[in-house]
């Protein structure tokens, strides 16, 4: 801030306070300009005097010079005082005629206009994320009023240039300036596009409305989708980080996150950069968020990180880089302090508006590029751009005039900030084509770049080509090291197994040598750029000729490169053994006993664990990452199980172990372990009366959950977990979704009241009964089978949900049958035989399962659907096992295949049927898959973490068998708790939370 020195100037009255603020504001702007001049190595010193204040601004050296020469300041102040006195005397001598009064009013109104204009410039600069003054484009704002919204103007005052305001309006604006703010919705449209952009303008106007409320915190997860038409299933995504490359090519489109507002703030130009209150970064940089605290990164380039849950607090979207972060009035100094930047991270987010906005921006940039490219090749009208050619021949084909730090790529790979900056610089953009013959030489590249192809296809084509180029480069350099002129295949595994005797020099910094299939696009590009200096060093050529077994698993030869999946599997097994042994000691047993984790979680008062490392709760080892597992192993001596009520766990023990427990601790008499007389074995009753039955007994069934039941306070992933709160929340959400479905079903029938949905009918006849408007990736089924994220997504999307009933008569018949089946009261058979049996086990909770005869046909259809899912799952498991070289079916990691596109390709699927888990497939699709079973084939393009491919015979390395099986199991344990598993018993569906330990 400028230095202020108090002088002895005569004080003015309080009317000058407004002008004082304007002067302070302008001096701050002057100081920002001096900082920019200092970056150009120009030195500036400035002394300003206003009333009783002396301002000293300038560069660091300039201020130091002025502060040492106090005589300069005194002389300047003295001169200003004398001139002020002369002006006052002359003012007294002049007569106050009407003309003079009018001139005074003109000066005043001009001053106020200047003040308002400067404040508008300050607000506009603040909306752009800058601390400097930015000129307001009044003409563009008035022409395209939906691009920039001005809030806080006094009621009845429209936004326009200050020169069009009268004196009273100007004063009124200055009095209410504390609430004035600019919000930039999108870049300005060109005039010709603005005339036809009614839809976009209407959308932008809707986005101006502030939300009437905000929804509660939403835990979501993300899966990659395609191009700009993306419909992210969740709001955030977990991906790897390549911090060394600022222009990492990301085929996966992320919704704005908390880091977007910080990392994507780039200046419009260096001249207006100023001092930013947040660090500038690159929008392409991806952030890795581990599921456990301080979990290390997977060493491979293609690693998949554990999924994370992101909480989004609000439901309205405003551009991250343009939104006014604080609704509080600005402080008296108009320039915001950098210290406040950290407090302005709360933003409202609405994916639909964000998606519409980024789609429109990408379309504009795509049209701009095509128009500029057509001008370069002298073609008429827009022309499709061969992006791969521009990326492969950067010296002969390139683009000039792009904003600094933005590489030329397909617009679908840019985020909103870069798209806006490109549009602002559209006049300077120019395509340079030095070799026109390149545009017609490579037809393969043009075929790979079809306009209809999505981001995934483009990414796959690009990375495949780059890997091929790098592999050819390595083969050539490897042959040179061996004294050969012909390229030779590189034994990558041997280089990894013997890093001291076989290695490569000249690779870019922080890039290890390995097979090109492990590199991402940024590293591949860097390797190609330094291809001339790459050199293979072979100290022991004999290693290349011997086929040793030690290279069959190169990633596990050294501790540094040990496979992550094998390592975490071993640690989990070790911790599991520790827990089992400690649990047995607590029961007074000598042999290890498997811990019933759900029982501990459900009874934390009577069953808990002491001595765990600080911050680590007690739960199944499959929930822990490597850091926590290692901490538990190191502190295993302190761990102690406390069992206050052994009767809670006795039913979970093996039959031979129960009799060895000290019976004094039991509160109830010991009973035989036979199934018919053991009171400790609870039996569950389920009464199935119809497809929509929801009996009290069903709701009372306790299912094992993966929640925390330890008495040790902890905060998993930053929040303290409460099973009661979670259970209450999911129960409430399920009820809301069920009520919503019932209301929509009634609307489809033309009724005002809600109608209970016959889910079995919808599942059995999907062509005649179906639901439209559900969020992408969410199938229609009972609300009880959904987790919290999907329930919340359904409620957010409730306005679009619509039930389609093509055969109302069949629907009414099903409703009547369901009603008639529920009308008679349930009768419990009281035959003498039953009474005799019940008398022997009076304390058992035995309940009959009653199935009305009318529902048998419907239940058989549901059973057929479940059988189809099992058959499809078995088919996929068998095909996947064949693809990875196994002779037996292997559980398919559906989620990992989905979030690692390009790693595993599934061919032979029926037309119109995409590959996904069987639980998400329609009945008709599953039948078509089974009909095409012989054509379906899994192909592993490149491995991903958790996938172990056995290319050797099983008997060559028998020790790999258990590891592979465990890793296959471990790869499935990464699925979050919120994944729905639908269990169908008759027509009633009971959601079971996955329990990897039982």
Curated annotation (Swiss-Prot):
It is found in: Cytoplasm; Nucleus. Its main location: cytoplasm. The modification Phosphothreonine is found at residues 556, 558. One of its GO terms (biological process) is negative regulation of angiogenesis. The modification Phosphoserine is found at residues 19, 103, 207, 210, 214, 412, 517, 668, 674, 722, 784, 823. Residues 302-317 have a biased composition (Acidic residues). Ubiquitous. The modification N-acetylalanine is found at residue 2. Residues 690-711 have a biased composition (Polar residues). Residues 328-337 have a biased composition (Pro residues). Interacts with the basal transcription machinery by coordinating the formation of a multiprotein complex at the C-FOS promoter, and linking specific signal responsive activator complexes. Promotes the formation of stable high-order complexes of SRF and PHOX1 and interacts cooperatively with PHOX1 to promote serum-inducible transcription of a reporter gene deriven by the C-FOS serum response element (SRE). Acts as a coregulator for USF1 by binding independently two promoter elements, a pyrimidine-rich initiator (Inr) and an upstream E-box. This is General transcription factor II-I. It comes from Mus musculus (Mouse). The gene is Gtf2i.
């Amino acid at each position: 801030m400028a230095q202020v020195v108090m002088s002895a100037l005569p004080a003015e009255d309080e009317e000058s306070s407004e002008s004082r603020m304007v002067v302070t504001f302008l001096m701050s702007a002057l100081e920002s300009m001096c900082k920019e001049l200092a970056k150009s190595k120009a030195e500036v010193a400035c002394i300003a005097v206003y009333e009783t204040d002396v301002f000293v601004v300038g560069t660091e050296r300039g201020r130091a010079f002025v502060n040492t020469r106090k005589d300069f300041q005194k002389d300047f102040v003295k001169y200003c005082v004398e001139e002020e006195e002369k002006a006052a005397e002359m003012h007294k001598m002049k007569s106050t005629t009407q003309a003079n009064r009018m001139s005074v009013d003109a000066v005043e109104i001009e001053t106020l206009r200047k003040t308002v204009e400067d404040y508008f410039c300050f607000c506009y600069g603040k909306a752009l994320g800058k601390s400097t003054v930015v000129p307001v484009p009044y003409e563009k704002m008035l022409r395209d009023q939906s691009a920039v919204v001005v809030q806080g103007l006094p009621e009845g005052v429209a936004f326009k240039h200050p020169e069009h305001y009268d004196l009273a309006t100007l004063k009124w604006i200055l009095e209410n300036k504390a609430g004035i703010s600019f919000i930039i919705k999108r870049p300005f449209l060109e005039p010709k596009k603005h005339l036809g952009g009614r839809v976009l303008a209407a959308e932008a106007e809707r986005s101006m409305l502030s939300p009437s409320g905000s929804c509660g915190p939403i835990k979501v997860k993300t899966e990659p989708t395609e191009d700009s038409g993306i419909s992210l299933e969740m709001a955030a995504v977990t991906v790897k980080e390549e911090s060394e490359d600022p222009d990492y090519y990301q085929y996966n489109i992320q919704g704005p996150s908390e880091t977007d507002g910080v990392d994507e703030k780039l200046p419009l130009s260096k001249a207006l950069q100023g001092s930013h209150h947040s660090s500038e970064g690159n929008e392409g940089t991806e952030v890795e968020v581990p599921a456990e605290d301080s979990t290390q990164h997977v060493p491979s380039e293609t690693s998949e990180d554990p999924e994370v849950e992101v909480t989004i607090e609000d439901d309205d979207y405003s551009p991250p880089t343009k939104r006014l972060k604080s609704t509080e009035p600005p402080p008296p100094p108009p320039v915001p302090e950098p210290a406040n930047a950290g407090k302005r991270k709360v933003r409202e987010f609405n994916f639909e508006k964000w998606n519409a906005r980024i789609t429109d921006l990408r379309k504009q940039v795509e049209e701009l590029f095509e128009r500029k490219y057509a001008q370069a090749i002298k073609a008429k009208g827009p022309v499709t751009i061969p992006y791969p050619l521009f990326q492969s021949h950067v010296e002969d084909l390139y683009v000039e005039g792009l904003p600094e730090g933005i590489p030329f790529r397909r617009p679908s790979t840019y985020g909103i900030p870069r798209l806006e900056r490109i549009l602002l610089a559209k006049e300077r953009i120019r395509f340079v084509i030095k070799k026109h013959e390149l545009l017609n030489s490579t037809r393969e590249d043009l075929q790979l770049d079809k306009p209809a192809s999505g981001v995934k296809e483009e990414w796959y084509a690009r990375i495949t080509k780059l890997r091929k180029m790098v592999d050819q480069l390595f083969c050539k350099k490897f042959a040179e090291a061996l004294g050969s002129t012909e390229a030779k295949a590189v034994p990558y595994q041997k280089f990894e197994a013997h890093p001291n005797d076989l290695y490569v020099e000249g690779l870019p910094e922080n890039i290890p040598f390995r097979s090109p299939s492990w590199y991402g696009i940024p590293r591949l590009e860097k390797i190609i750029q330094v291809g001339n200096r790459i050199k293979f060093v072979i100290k022991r050529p004999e290693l290349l000729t011997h086929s040793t077994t030690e290279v069959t698993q190169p990633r596990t030869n050294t501790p540094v490169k040990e496979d992550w999946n094998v390592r975490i599997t071993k640690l989990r097994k070790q911790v599991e053994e520790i827990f089992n042994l400690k649990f047995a000691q607590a029961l007074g047993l000598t042999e290890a006993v498997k811990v019933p984790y759900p029982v501990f979680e459900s009874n934390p008062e009577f069953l808990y664990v002491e001595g765990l490392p600080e911050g680590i709760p007690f739960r199944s080892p499959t929930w822990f990452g490597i850091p926590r597992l290692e901490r538990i192993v190191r502190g295993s001596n302190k761990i102690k199980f406390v069992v206050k009520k052994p009767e809670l766990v006795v039913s979970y023990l093996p039959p031979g172990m129960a009799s060895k427990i000290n019976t004094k601790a039991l509160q109830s008499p010991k009973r035989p372990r036979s199934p018919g007389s053991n009171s400790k074995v609870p039996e569950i009753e389920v009464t199935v009366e119809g497809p929509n039955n929801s009996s009290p007994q069903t709701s009372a069934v306790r299912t094992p959950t993966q929640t925390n039941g330890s008495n040790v306070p902890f905060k998993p992933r930053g929040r303290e977990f409460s099973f009661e709160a979670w259970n209450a929340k999911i129960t409430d959400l399920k009820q809301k979704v069920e009520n919503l479905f019932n209301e929509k079903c009634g609307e489809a029938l033309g009724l005002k009241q809600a109608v209970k949905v016959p889910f079995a009918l919808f599942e059995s006849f999907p062509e005649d009964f179906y639901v439209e408007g559900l969020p992408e990736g969410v199938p229609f089924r009972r609300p009880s089978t959904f987790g919290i994220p999907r329930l919340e997504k359904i409620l957010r999307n409730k306005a679009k949900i619509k039930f389609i009933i093509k055969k109302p008569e069949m629907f009414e018949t099903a409703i009547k049958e369901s009603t008639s089946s529920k009308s008679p009261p349930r009768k419990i058979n009281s035959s003498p035989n039953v009474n005799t049996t019940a008398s022997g086990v009076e304390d058992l909770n035995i309940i009959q399962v009653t199935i009305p005869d009318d529902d048998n046909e419907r239940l058989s259809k549901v059973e057929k659907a479940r059988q189809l899912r099992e058959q499809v799952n078995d088919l996929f498991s068998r095909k996947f096992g064949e693809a990875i070289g196994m002779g037996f079916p292997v559980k398919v990691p559906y989620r990992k295949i989905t979030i690692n596109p390009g790693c595993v390709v599934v061919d032979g699927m029926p037309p119109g049927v995409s590959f996904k888990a069987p639980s998400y497939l329609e009945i008709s699709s599953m039948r078509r898959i089974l009909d095409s079973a012989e054509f379906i084939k899994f192909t592993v393009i490149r491995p991903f973490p958790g996938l172990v491919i056995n290319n050797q015979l099983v008997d060559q390395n028998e020790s790999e068998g258990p590891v592979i099986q465990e890793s296959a199991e471990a790869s499935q344990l990464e699925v979050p708790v919120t994944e729905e598993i639908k269990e169908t018993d008759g027509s009633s569906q009971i959601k079971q939370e996955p329990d990897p330990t039982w």
